[in-house]
Amino acid sequence: MVPMHTSTEERDVRVALLPVGSFEQHGPFLPLATDTVIACTVAEEIAERYPVRVLPPVTISCSHEHAGWPGTVSISAATLYAVVRDVAESLRGAGVPKLVLVSGHGGNYVLGNAVQESAGAMALFPGMDEWEDARTAAGMATSGISDMHAGELETSILLHAHPELVRPGYEGSDHLADDRRHLLTAGMAPYTASGVIGRPSLASAGKGRDALASLVGAFGNRLAVLDQQGQAARQGGHEGQHAVDDGDGEALGGA
């Protein structure tokens, strides 16, 4: 998951992908690095189809809602924001004007703020709509509300892309907690003893494959809007054009 490109291969890159994961509990059957693995998998499959380059991932982020579980490690939102802004600035200095944050963790709310402030130089992917479309394309039986964490979607993606990382037990680990109105204040603990919120028993490699294919296909629209933002910014001073809303402000698909 660490890119091995040479400096020469990077010369003509205009768009970079920064996978942003987490290091947090995912129940007894998925690894702490699940969100990072998913973000990297999405980014790598995108890079096979579009003219972009994948950066090394951010592996620790904002997982404070999981603080009660062993192994979970977090950084502050301010630190994550600073890392993203520093990476974007460094890329611009190297001639790469655009950065897409490929997030595998829904708790990284600050990524949306970084994108909002970037004046069209960043995008956040996947957004809520892309995740929901991926669920539909894959025939997921669990809704996005119910399938919050270590459920059908995440387990399916790992069963497809990295089955060696899925330990036995997911078939009997279903747990639903749709009413999570105090999650930000109280964290995950009041809603699950195992760390799972969802129905991993319904996961399959085929669903993971189809979900990823949907996400890769959807990225083309996000890339086109990001490029259009750049054109609007270059022309705006002369023609009064406005930036195009690409929906980056929407919430992410999981936790």
Label the model's feature ranges.
Residues 236-251:
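Alpha-helix boundary/capping motif
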Residues 1-98, 104-237, 253-255:
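Extended, histidine- and acidic-residue-enriched regions that form the cofactor-binding/catalytic faces
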